[in-house]
């Protein structure tokens, strides 16, 4: 049973890569549905902003509470800003934003396309001489690739602001000390790595959710199974990709805090 599920999962991942190649091949001749693109951008961006901000704020509160008291105990409050800002810029903001979008938007994409596949609406598109990649897949991919970096940037800004507030109100750490250590340790490449990760995660969310919907079968039960499998696969792929990207981006950079202290 496990071998069968693993084989099926690998086949779907291969078909996702094929979908990626097919979309790239059609970019020059593609008929872009601007209204659908605008709708998807709103769904992924403004439609997901509230939950993204709430999650970022509360995660930042908890993370700051746990880190700040330990740093005060070690008499290392001057390094608090550097650690928190680096953690959110390099890892937490892009990953948490991607997880939220995977659960909210990825599941929606899969359920929508799977329902269309089950009710033969995909076949109807072919009869109308409309390629599903143009009409369904591209707007979703473009929306995720455009909005994930923007949402991650907003999430990062909110997380840092909340962290500064909690550090001052609960532990008496001045914002000047927090920001000084943060700016000394943070580099432009760290911010660009956040954007690059967000772009990769947006691509993963869009392609996997669309492909799992296009290959759905088995009626209403199949729609549910495809949606669940889609989200699980997206999350697993995001975590694996995050490790690979982090390894190549940061493994050889050395300590940012030590470099900041030397300035």
Swiss-Prot record:
GO terms for molecular function: phospholipid transporter activity. Keywords: Chloroplast, Membrane, Plastid, Transmembrane, Transmembrane helix, Transport. Signal peptide: none annotated. It comes from the Eukaryota. InterPro entries: ABC_MlaE_roteobac, Permease_MalE. GO terms for cellular component: ATP-binding cassette (ABC) transporter complex; chloroplast membrane. Its main location: plastid. The chain crosses the membrane at residues 43-63, 82-102, 136-156, 159-179, 199-219, 230-250. It is found in: Plastid, Chloroplast membrane. It is a multi-pass membrane protein. Belongs to the MlaE permease family. NCBIfam families: MlaE family lipid ABC transporter permease subunit (TIGR00056). PANTHER family: ABC TRANSPORTER PERMEASE PROTEIN-RELATED (PTHR30188), PROTEIN TRIGALACTOSYLDIACYLGLYCEROL 1, CHLOROPLASTIC (PTHR30188:SF4). Could be part of an ABC transporter complex. This is Probable ABC transporter permease protein ycf63. The lineage of its organism: Eukaryota, Rhodophyta, Bangiophyceae, Bangiales, Bangiaceae.
């Amino acid at each position: 049973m496990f071998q069968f599920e693993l084989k099926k999962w690998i086949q779907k991942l291969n078909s996702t890569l094929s979908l990626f190649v097919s979309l790239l091949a059609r970019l020059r001749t593609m008929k872009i549905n601007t209204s659908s693109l605008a709708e998807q951008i709103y769904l992924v961006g403004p439609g997901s902003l509230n939950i993204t901000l709430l999650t970022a704020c509360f995660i930042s509160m908890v993370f700051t509470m746990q880190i700040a008291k330990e740093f005060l105990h070690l008499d290392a409050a001057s390094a608090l800003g550097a650690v928190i800002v680096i953690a959110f810029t390099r890892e937490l903001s892009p990953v948490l934003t991607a997880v939220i979008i995977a659960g909210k938007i990825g599941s929606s994409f899969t359920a929508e396309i799977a329902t269309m596949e089950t009710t033969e609406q995909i076949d109807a598109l072919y009869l109308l001489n409309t390629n599903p990649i143009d009409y369904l897949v591209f707007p979703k991919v473009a929306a995720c690739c455009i909005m994930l970096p923007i949402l991650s940037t907003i999430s990062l800004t909110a997380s840092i602001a909340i962290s500064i507030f909690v550090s001052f109100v609960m532990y008496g750490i001045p914002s000047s000390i927090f920001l000084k250590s943060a700016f000394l340790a943070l580099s432009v490449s760290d911010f660009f790595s956040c954007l690059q990760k967000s772009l990769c995660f947006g691509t993963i969310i869009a392609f996997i959710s669309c492909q799992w919907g296009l290959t759905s079968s088995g009626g209403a039960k199949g729609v549910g199974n495809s949606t669940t499998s889609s989200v699980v696969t997206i999350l697993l792929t995001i975590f694996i990709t995050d490790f690979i990207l982090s390894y190549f981006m940061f493994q050889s950079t050395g300590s940012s805090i030590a470099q900041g202290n030397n300035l």
